[in-house]
Amino acid sequence: MPVASRKKSSASNAAKRVDSTQSPSPGEEVSIGTPEKAPKLHKRSRSGCFTCRLRRKKCDEKHPACGACSNLCVKCEYKRPIWWGNAEQRRIQKERIKNKIKQTKMNERNGSATDPLARSRNMAATSPLSPVFDFNRPGHTETYDLFSSHLPTPGLNQTMYAPYAPYEIDVKTERQTFINDVPLRHDSSISTFSTFTAPQLSAPLPTFPSEDWLQDEYFSQAPNLSGIDPAICEQSFGQTYTTLQSNIPVSDHDRPLLDHFIHNVLRIIFPVLEAHQRGHTRAQAILQALETNKCYLHCCLSVAAIHLKTTEGFVGEQIDHDIMRHRFEAVSHLCQALSEDINHEEILDATLAMIFFHCSVGPADDYLPDIPWFDHFQAASNLVNRLGLPTAVPEGNPYVLPPFSMTLTSWIDILGSTMQGRTPQFAHTYRAKHLSGSSSGLRELMGCDDRVMYLISEITCLDALKTEGRIDAMAVCSHVSALGRQLEFTEPVDQTLEHPFSPTTGAIRPEILTKNMTTVFRIAARIYLCSLVPGFDRNQPSNLNLVAAVANTLNYIPSGPNGFDRSLVWPLLITGAFSAPTSQFRAVLAERASLLGDHADLGSFGRMYRLLQEVWRLTDDPADSYYTPEETSSSSASSGSPVPKIERSASPESNSTGSSMREIKKQQVHWRDVMQRNGWHYLLI
């Protein structure tokens, strides 16, 4: 064997002996040439644990728990924890961390950590190798609530912890932002963090803004991409917004429509989601879809043209041509993708956009030809089943939310089924989620608690069974009683109503807002449920009290163009349809409609108010109201006013001679029948 090979082999053997015995000889140390190092326990990440990333703190990444997580008594996780998927659990986590930080500061200020014995005990308690409290595990046994949408609230750990011993560490921080896999920004910095300097206990401790753990907006919005600092996303949002807008391929003729959609339509589509997430995450997703999804793009351009026509007063053949041209292009791309059986997720997004965007901004008397929303939804429900979205999230985990497309589908399915008096497409899924306490994300999207929405689905099923004659009156009353008790379980412990605006900052508080909106939906669901009882009368005291309760709750929900009345279309419809002529609710609704201005005539709100006015006209004074079926068909076909003609009898002789007319009796005209008679295919959500 050559000499060089023997030397290399001996050096390798010496290195192995060093690793096995941990006591190398001097000769072996010379052959290795490097000092001994402790073995690495785990692979370091690029940005630290989840808690340190959100706090924008330096993470030492010790194993199994970093120093910051050990001090704060939280479980050190590098992936998104399950409590992050629920706003209430995020708020509880935030309060616990803030209290722990305040407690630690008070201990430092009072000199509680100066005792060597106490210091050593606390250091042992907060060792990285010691177990940490898991916020995801309940601290005490609680009674299981069948109708609760959240897991039992974890108990608060009362163990006292002191800071680590002084140390010094160099931390290199790298931050990089990607859009469509293209790096837009890269920041790198190296900083030294030292705790060797003892604080002067006689001086007041400074205020550390970052010790608030998470700013409010981080608890109100969850980033879609793990490992991306939300602060960077918010700071660079304006630049990213402009970049994405410029990348959308449109012609010069359609560029004004795109700009109008982005700056005027996009911000009014999801007002509740805007309050919860400040709209940035959803707006970026929509802009990216506009860039890559042709069908989605043409749908949005058509909606923008409709909004321009109704708000800016554009009239003429050109604007109608733009609307129909983009409608045709959207349907053409949709049919092409369906025939090729590709891009199912993009097809689903575009189909849901065709349904929801149009019902958000379209006029009440749109005379241009279009495909009814329920035909679009039939295709969307088939795509949802093909993609397996109803079972995408395992049952029993209330913290993991389903995809956004499934949440939007659930919203349309539950409330849209009441428009047609049929069972929701995914009623079994909602029933299973209700029993397991799983969330569908409806509360953050449209403002109503998921449990109430699940019960509305059950009420709709009962309505469909009654309409089809599959159950008798006794069974209807039994189901109404059972569902009424379940609605009571969804009521909060504290039923006090308060305004959603913060008294100190004036900012909207999404938790209070959704609580008030859920109250309106819950009362409307009870009115809808009671209306199924045989012999129901809108003038009975119980119904009058429920309608008055809705009118009172509306005082705690912001109104006007920047309010949330357009998110309450369904409960306003149900309450108004069963309100008495002298009800205060009608005056409140008229006032809030006037505050909306031009927006009161647009979208679902305008259609809802138009339908209510027609229902009131037919039911409030039925003694001299007559309905002619022939006049309805001719009236609805006209582009002017599809409202059926109401004739007033001038003499008793006219009553006897009108053989083709039939008198509309009180409480015999349902709001759903009025829609069908006039050919109004409304989706009032």
Swiss-Prot record:
Keyword Nucleus: yes
Pfam family, one: Fungal_trans_2
DNA-binding region: 49-76
Disruption phenotype: Increases radial growth, remediates the germination defect of a laeA deletion, and increases virulence in the G.mellonella model of invasive aspergillosis.
GO molecular function, one term: zinc ion binding
Compartments (UniProt record): Nucleus
UniProt GO cellular component terms: nucleus
Induction: Expression is repressed by laeA.
Biased composition (Low complexity): 626-642
Residue numbers spanned by region Disordered: 1-42, 626-668
InterPro entries: Fun_TF, Zn2-C6_fun-type_DNA-bd_sf, Zn2Cys6_DnaBD
Polar residues bias (residue ranges): 651-660
Role this protein plays: Transcription factor that mediates stress and developmental response.
Name the record gives this protein: C6 finger domain transcription factor nosA
Organism from which the protein derives: Aspergillus fumigatus (strain ATCC MYA-4609 / CBS 101355 / FGSC A1100 / Af293) (Neosartorya fumigata)
